[in-house]
Structures are given as structure tokens and as C-alpha cells.
Amino acid sequence: MVEQVPVTLVGGGRVGRALAGALGPRGGLAGPVVRRGGRGWDEVPPGRRPVLLCTGAQHLEEAVSECPPERRPDLVFMQNGALEPWLAARGLEGCTRALLYLSAEEGGAALKDGGGRSSVTGPWAVVTREALGAAGIGAREVPRRDFGRLAFEKLLWSSVFWCLSAGRGGAPVGELVQDPGALSELEGLVAELLAVRIRAQFGRIFELAECRRWLENALNFLRSLFSVYLANLGIVKKRAEGGGQV
């Protein structure tokens, strides 16, 4: 039996809804999912627990301002990107952060793990990792400095694939992963962006071997998601051919 992990969820998007659906039946939620406008905070029971902030990065300012001041140290930021300057400017640099490798179905029906590559750091790291595990997402607890490097890698992942997709007329990631020509361009993009990385943050520039290691890890993650997509597509096709409900 999965251990119950009491957390508060903020954000009703795909990830927030999927986490609520996974944790709610196990008693792992403390109060309702808090929505935009702060709706639901008055129903959250008192006490210290992680507050998983599942809003988009564009809504962070609003979500933090709506959070009761006494609960802000418990915030767990689930967004990608280099948030450190933004957090420090608001006195939130000591909060927990989570770096998620997963895919969420439209409507928040389910989450697909990205190979256990998700990472968590900060005061609520252990409980957050357990909550993610209860939802089927493997994660590891890492030191703050290591998290900064991993967060940069995830930001790089997003940047290179969006850039290449735009350059190829909006080609989906699954198509890029299967195209040898696209993979060659990806390696070039990664090397170019790593070369201009600020040395001061990590103390050195990434080596070419690290570039290739990172690229292979990223491709393995994408291939795992793409294989699930193809499997689901096959199930839908069989149901349609058999006259079953799709």
C-alpha cells in the first residue's frame, strides 16, 4: 500500500489535475486544489506541509501573491527554467524546487513518467518525492548545486527542441527524434548553446563529451514518450477497426 503523503496542490492545469486524481483517492491531499484567484485557500486545513505549485511560469507572480504569507516557505516550485533570480528577489530562494520529466495527457487524465529523471531539492524534497512517487513519477533528491545544473539541462532541452521544431515548420518532437538529419542539427545546437554558457555559475564550460551525454539522455527520454504515444495510437486504431469504442 502506498504511503499517504499529505500535500496541498495549487493549479488546475494538466499536471495539477493529474496529481490530484492520483493522490486524492489515497488520502494524500490536504484540502481542495487551489485555483486561480486563490479559490480554495480558505478550505485548506492548518499545519505545515508542501504546497505543490503546479501553475504555469507566467502565473507565478499571481499564485505567490495569493498564497497566505505564512505558507510561502512551504511552496514547491514545479516550473522549468532559471528561477533563482526571481525567487531570490522575493525572498523565496530557500523554497523547494522540483524538476519534472513527465508528460501529462490533455485534461489531466494521467501522467507518464519520463524514466525516473525528475529531481527535487529543498526542505520539502523528501515528502515531494514521495508524493510524486505515489502518482507514478520517479524522482530523486539532489543537493541544491546539482539541481542548478540539472535545471539548466532541462532548460536547454526545451530550447533546442522548440528551436529545431520551429525551424522545421513546426515538426513534432516525435518526428524529430526519428530523423537522423534532425539529430545531427540537435547536436550542433546543443554544442552552440553550451559554448556560451556563463562559466561563473558552474565554474567551467561543459565539455563536448558532456554535450553528447546530455543529448543521448534527452533523446532516450523523448523516445520513451514517443513509444508510449505509438502504443496508445495502436490501441486506438485496433478499437476503431474492431468497431469498439474509441
Where are these regions (language model features)?
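Eukaryotic N-terminal low-complexity, Ser/Thr- and Lys/Arg-rich leader segments
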Residues: 1-4, 26
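NAD(P)-dependent Rossmann-like dehydrogenase/reductase catalytic/cofactor-binding core
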Residues: 4-5, 42, 187-246
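Conserved N-terminal Rossmann-fold NAD(P)-binding element of oxidoreductases
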Residues: 7-11
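Rossmann-like NAD(P)(H) cofactor-binding subdomain of soluble oxidoreductases
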Residues: 12-24, 36-113
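Short beta-strand "acidic-cap" motif of Rossmann-like dinucleotide-binding folds
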Residues: 29-35
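Rossmann-fold dinucleotide-binding core
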Residues: 77-154, 160
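Helix-loop-beta segment of a Rossmann-like dinucleotide-binding subdomain
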Residues: 103-117, 169-178, 227-237
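Active-site-proximal catalytic alpha-helix in oxidoreductases
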Residues: 147-194
